[in-house]
Swiss-Prot record:
One Pfam match: Arf
Function: GTP-binding protein involved in protein trafficking; regulates endocytic recycling and cytoskeleton remodeling. May modulate vesicle budding and uncoating within the Golgi apparatus. May contribute to the regulation of dendritic branching, filopodia extension and dendritic spine development.
Protein name as annotated: ADP-ribosylation factor 6
Gene Ontology BP terms: cell differentiation; intracellular protein transport; nervous system development; protein localization to endosome; regulation of dendritic spine development; vesicle-mediated transport
Binding of GTP, residues: 23-28, 41-44, 63-67, 122-125, 155-156
Cellular component, GO annotation: cleavage furrow; cytoplasm; cytosol; endocytic vesicle; endosome; filopodium membrane; Flemming body; Golgi apparatus
Localization per record: Cytoplasm, Cytosol; Cell membrane; Endosome membrane; Recycling endosome membrane
EC numbers for this chain: 3.6.5.2
Reactions the enzyme catalyzes: GTP + H2O = GDP + phosphate + H(+)
Family: Belongs to the small GTPase superfamily. Arf family.
Top-level taxon in the UniProt lineage: Eukaryota
Covalent lipid adducts (N6-myristoyl lysine), residues: 3
EC class: hydrolase
């Protein structure tokens, strides 16, 4: 019955996995979208899961900690994922190669082959932040031809770019 109402009234659900290196801004983004305000966060050990409704889409967002010790556990969250949000700490030029490796490890997993990919180029408000075109190049996105991906500049603290990213997800998700 619920699926019938969804088809009639346009409500969709989408399972989103939010990944990125530690301190990229994943949890700040999650709670900015959920609560509309900035919250003080601590490093995520384990995961946070919240439902965010935007434009008649219920996003079930799984924010899993980014510390290197728990990254091997990420794959346990892949099944059923329809969209990947990968958050990049744009001023952190020293770890962009590490971010690229982790991104490609995720998207090359067979469980993630159908997921669309949104990159939040985060912390655009900070000096020396890499711009979206630079993130696109450094993450090797132009070589990904068989997947739908997009780089959205963002600032988790202010909320800039976050809803534009969700708009891209809603426009590009095929249920």
């Amino acid at each position: 019955m619920g699926k019938m109402f969804s088809k009639i009234f346009g409500n969709k659900e989408m399972r989103i996995l939010m990944r990125g290196l530690d301190a990229a801004g994943k949890t700040t983004i999650l709670y900015k979208l959920k609560l509309g305000q900035s919250v003080t966060t601590i490093p995520t050990v384990g995961f946070n899961v919240e439902t965010v409704t935007y434009k008649n889409v219920k996003f079930n967002v799984w924010d899993v900690g980014g510390q290197d010790k728990i990254r091997p556990l990420w794959r346990h969250y892949y099944t059923g994922t329809q969209g990947l949000i990968f958050v990049v700490d744009c001023p952190d030029r020293d770890r962009i190669d590490e971010a690229r490796q982790e991104l490609h490890r995720i998207i090359n997993d067979r469980e993630m082959r159908d997921a669309i990919i949104l990159i939040f180029a985060n912390k655009q408000d900070l000096p020396d932040a890499m711009k979206p075109h630079e993130i696109q190049e450094k993450l090797g996105l132009t070589r990904i031809r068989d997947r739908n991906w997009y780089v959205q500049p963002s600032c988790a603290a202010s909320g800039d770019g976050l809803y534009e990213g969700l708009t891209w997800l809603t426009s590009n998700y095929k249920s």
